[in-house]
């Protein structure tokens, strides 16, 4: 711990409360052994350093990405060199990237106001996404319907689009989830593109047509509305919910550590200031509970797919344990077929495997809860990229990402269609 205190002394108290990103950099650190992983892991839990780990230390074959505030760059780089840790700068000036992103959004908003058309190749506000959900439902009233499933901590509505041919009540269904981690904007953007793709391709594409003839699709494009709004108004890199934690000034919980699946186990924290804080109890976050209640009341979901970013991964249970899921062989086969279909568009390569051994242990996750509650076909996509931009994927990659992801999603849903249980 001595070296942590040493860095803290060098940095001093000037970084306290820093929310700006001028001169902040993202470093990629290549770890080679368990000792190096251990040293970096201790830094993850050192609040005074104000480091933001985008990719946490977990294994030798997985680099560590960390956002370093400008005031701590010199000290942190000195520490890395002193420990013989190799690193490279992947983002030179984070604020410059954010400024470009903001300029693009404002430009797009102006164009959309004048044309009254939704640009699927741009990032949008929560209100714009909800408005487009209304448009989709209005354009295809016999196929799509917007359904309110609950509300957020700050009382924002949570909407899903239900796609159904209307033949039967509580038919077999697939749940598509996105935006549970608010800063992962490519997931929300991919989800709303996917919504339009479903209605546009019905009765044109035999695959999606046959899927909807046999089962329904429920799509939640923004699973963490408060966090998403906060990323656009206060802190672009906010990950958690915006709930209050009694006894702590730190806000929110990680909604993907809050599900009742080995809750409070490995890969989650009991520290409210941690980005992987699991919350006071399972389903404490109203956003999570709304989904849980809806799915349990419905009672006939066969698939659950959660869209995240970044790293280009396609994973399945378990995250909370290294033990193999009973259906691991089938899930792995389906995931590899989906990854192959995805790669056929532009060659984007995805790594496939169970969450725990592919990235890191993660208790309380959505897909583990789904799987443990009888939803056999449970998968997580970590979308583009592998670290060049990380969570700040440029808008010109939205449509290419969505197009390739669609083939992966469709492959999984076809398997669900053909293997209902």
Swiss-Prot record:
Gene Ontology terms for molecular function: metallocarboxypeptidase activity; zinc ion binding
Q: Which GO terms describe its cellular component?
A: extracellular space
Which interval of the chain is the signal sequence? 1-16
The gene name reads CPA4
State one Pfam family annotation.
Answer: Propep_M14
Q: Which GO terms describe its biological process?
A: hormone catabolic process; peptide catabolic process; proteolysis
What is this protein's name?
Answer: Carboxypeptidase A4
Q: Describe the family membership recorded for this protein in Swiss-Prot or TrEMBL.
A: Belongs to the peptidase M14 family.
What does the cofactor field's note say? Binds 1 zinc ion per subunit.
Q: Which Gene3D superfamilies match?
A: Metallocarboxypeptidase-like, Zn peptidases
Regulation of this protein's activity per its record: Inhibited by interaction with the metallocarboxypeptidase inhibitor (MCPI) from N.versicolor that binds to the catalytic zinc ion. Also inhibited by interaction with the S.magnifica carboxypeptidase inhibitor SmCI that penetrates the active site groove and inhibits activity by emulating a C-terminal substrate. Additionally inhibited by a carboxypeptidase inhibitor from H.medicinalis (leech) and R.bursa (tick).
The family database entries (CDD domains) matched by this protein are listed as: M14_CPA (cd03870)
